[in-house]
Amino acid sequence: MRSRLLLPVPHLPTIRETSEELSHGAPGQEPPASPSLDDYVRCICQLAQPTSVLDKATAWSPPNRSCRPAWPREKRHQSESLEDSSPCFSSLQPTLPAPGTDNPLDWLFGKSQEQQTDRRDLPNRTGSSGHWGVHRQMGKDSGRPSEARVPEYSLGRKPGHRHQTSNLKSWTSRKPCQALASVSSSRPSSILGTLYLHLPVIHEL
């Protein structure tokens, strides 16, 4: 029963049959030439460009021409800002060796020695200020700011002379407790002095 119903239905045309009919066409006409690759690319380019956008671009073209002189002004402003900022960057860049120097390593070695000498001078300056601050604090704690001691290397005195003056002051003070305190306070100051000389100094960049 089912086979009888399917028989009177006409078969659908396949792709091969339709392509043959289109290619042959009428019996007296020649088959049309197949499009080349260039034609195919041109068609795609034309389809990719919508006409509405092109019409809007052509309509807005006159005002764009009037706005074109603004570009050179912006470029001039940018060049002036770059020229103003160039001295700041040039000061940060390291100095290059002179063209007359034969070996650049000698120049680099000389620069490193100069930096080392500058770093050695800085600890001495900071160390002297640190000694003064320590002696002032010790004098304030003991209640006798007049007895604050000066570092040895600043006045060029010998350590023995300093101990003699401290001993004389202790004998004239009429108080053995104060004499012992002055002798004990002289020892930490000398220890702190040696520590400040050997401590490394950290330079902020």
From Swiss-Prot:
Keywords: Cytoplasm. Residues 71-80, 138-150 have a biased composition (Basic and acidic residues). InterPro entries: DEPP (IPR020133). The keyword Cytoplasm applies. The keyword Cytoplasm applies. It is found in: Cytoplasm. GO terms for cellular component: cytoplasm; mitochondrion; peroxisome. Coiled coil: none annotated. One of its GO terms (biological process) is regulation of autophagy. Residues 56-173 are annotated as: Disordered. It comes from the Eukaryota. May play a role in autophagy. This is Protein DEPP. It comes from Rattus norvegicus.
